[in-house]
């Protein structure tokens, strides 16, 4: 799940909470309080580009993103999310499709979560090794007030087109701090370690600072600066090694610092 997903889900929770507060109180004549009902929310985002864990996946092009989330009062949840991507970054791929579900709760003031994520890239395959880009992760998370920590661990054999990378880990530390006027300051630090012999060249770290503004009727806007740094130059001169129509190779620094702007609508 990406920065935009996290912002969309966090804003959805805020939006639903405000709606609940605005609802009329139950009358004293009611025999029993109504049981909390499951919630279903949808979100649509238009972003200036798609950056996931500090890496630019839409090759500097705009991205269209959408998701659907179901949350049960017991703490169980499930959802799906998709984004356009570039086939210059993912060979023969134009869509990332995520499916996820799990459980979350709280003890005292500390929140916790355990979820399974399945990432699908229809038709995408890195033909040099015959490896598909699909992979799966288990994510364990903790939250306290505006702080959060999450660790994702790859449980599939391969990781994003990299073969034999089971055990790849990504540590996500951050904060979403309300600063008044409907604004939230978004801070993030990430550390990715790719498992498997020789795969350490794909290790990376990334950081982000952003600001999200909640608007009326489920709308929000956000802006962020994000940057990554790889353990090698693999991200600085990233290429699939496939000649384009002119016979040249498409090469880009997918880790360089960049600004991402987005508009999100929660339904």
Protein language model regions, located:
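Cleavable N-terminal export/targeting peptides
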Residues: 1-39
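Short glycine/proline- and aromatic-enriched beta-strand/turn motifs that initiate or cap beta-hairpins
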Residues: 28-86, 258, 264
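Solvent-exposed loop segments that connect transmembrane elements
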Residues: 32, 90, 197-199, 232-251
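Transmembrane beta-strands of outer-membrane beta-barrel pores
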Residues: 46-52, 72, 82-86, 105, ...
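Outer-membrane beta-barrel architecture
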Residues: 67-69, 100-102, 139-141, 172-176, ...
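Outer-membrane beta-barrel "beta-signal"
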Residues: 209-219, 225-227, 250-267
């Amino acid at each position: 799940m990406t920065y935009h997903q996290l912002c969309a889900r966090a804003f959805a929770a805020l939006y639903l909470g405000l709606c609940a507060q605005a609802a009329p109180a139950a009358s004293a004549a009611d025999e029993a309080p109504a049981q909390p009902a499951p919630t279903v929310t949808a979100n649509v985002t238009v972003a200036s580009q798609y950056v996931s864990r500090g890496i630019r996946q839409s090759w500097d092009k705009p991205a269209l993103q959408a998701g659907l989330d179901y949350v049960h009062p017991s703490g169980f949840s499930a959802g799906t999310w998709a984004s356009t991507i570039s086939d210059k970054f993912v060979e023969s791929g134009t869509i990332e499709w995520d499916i996820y579900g799990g459980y979350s709760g709280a003890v005292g003031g500390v929140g916790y979560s355990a979820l399974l994520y399945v990432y699908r890239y229809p038709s995408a395959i890195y033909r040099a090794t015959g490896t598909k880009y699909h992979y799966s992760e288990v994510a364990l998370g903790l939250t306290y007030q505006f702080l959060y920590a999450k660790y994702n661990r790859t449980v599939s054999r391969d990781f994003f087109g990299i073969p034999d990378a089971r055990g790849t880990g990504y540590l996500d530390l951050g904060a979403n701090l309300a600063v008044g006027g409907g604004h939230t300051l978004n801070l993030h630090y990430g550390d990715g370690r790719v498992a498997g012999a020789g795969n350490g060249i794909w290790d990376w770290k990334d950081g982000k600072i952003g600001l999200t503004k909640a608007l009326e009727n489920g709308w929000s806007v956000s802006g962020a600066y994000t940057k990554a740094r790889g353990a090698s130059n693999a991200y600085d001169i990233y290429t699939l090694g496939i000649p384009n129509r002119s016979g040249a190779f498409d090469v880009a620094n997918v880790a360089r610092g960049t600004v991402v702007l987005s508009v999100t609508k929660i339904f």
